[in-house]
């Protein structure tokens, strides 16, 4: 992958928690700067570490850069023809009603549909991989989702601002297949929604994926897209190289 927002977030959270585990009184930084292979990433922490029955970590917010949407991509006309052919071959004209091509480090095809499911992404994902346009592409199917009072409370507590827009998504990642979550994908989904004029980009937007929820915002079109979400320890281990 060209970029991995989830990986950046997890790396920053690991850096945050290790000194805290050794000494809970250690001062927690507001930001951590990470040096990547081709760039640098700054991660902000939204909130504080809260102790209780289970330790609650703050959300980690990462600047993900700016997206190129549809005609901002040089090959948009060719991709449009390719998508039209696939829609015809599958007898799925609904694919053409609301779709976007987004580049944000990685490339993404996003289809907004009335009905989505894991079975559908397993059907569509592999089909879009084979093309002379790319060596694979991330594919997402999305739909709008009702925001509950609980969603508003949780987001207000975590972000200082309640969300008013929420989308559900399933993901097929280039070279990996169906995955639980995709950080650059969630940002690209939000970018496609803003470009369509469906919501205010300066407000946090929620994207629900099988692996959990991410929050996305972009104060203005000239700013970086910011992705915020949790990171939790899955396991520890050692690798001998």
Per-region residue spans from a language model:
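Active-site proximal loop and beta-alpha junction motif in alpha/beta enzyme cores
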Residues: 1-3, 8-181, 188-241
């Amino acid at each position: 992958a060209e970029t991995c927002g989830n990986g950046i977030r997890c790396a920053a959270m690991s850096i945050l928690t290790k000194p805290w585990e050794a000494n809970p009184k250690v001062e927690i930084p507001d930001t951590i700067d990470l040096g990547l292979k081709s760039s640098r990433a700054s991660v902000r922490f939204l909130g504080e570490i809260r102790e209780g029955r289970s330790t609650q970590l703050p959300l980690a917010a990462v600047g993900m850069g700016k997206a190129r949407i549809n005609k901002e991509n040089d090959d948009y006309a060719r991709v449009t023809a390719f998508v039209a052919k696939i829609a015809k071959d599958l007898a799925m004209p609904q694919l053409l009603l609301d779709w976007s091509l987004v580049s944000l480090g990685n490339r993404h095809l996003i289809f907004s549909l009335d009905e989505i499911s894991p079975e559908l992404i397993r059907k569509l994902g592999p089909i879009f991989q084979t093309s002379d346009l790319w060596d694979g592409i991330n594919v997402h199917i999305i739909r709008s989702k009702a925001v509950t009072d609980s969603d508003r409370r949780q987001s207000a507590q975590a972000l200082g601002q309640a969300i008013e827009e929420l989308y559900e998504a399933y993901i097929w990642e280039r070279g990996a297949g169906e995955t639980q979550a995709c950080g650059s994908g969630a940002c690209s989904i939000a970018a496609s929604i803003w470009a369509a004029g469906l919501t205010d980009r300066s407000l946090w937007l929620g994207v629900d994926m099988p692996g959990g929820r991410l929050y996305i915002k972009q104060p203005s079109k000239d700013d970086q897209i910011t992705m915020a979400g949790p990171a939790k320890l899955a396991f520890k281990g050692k690798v001998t190289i």
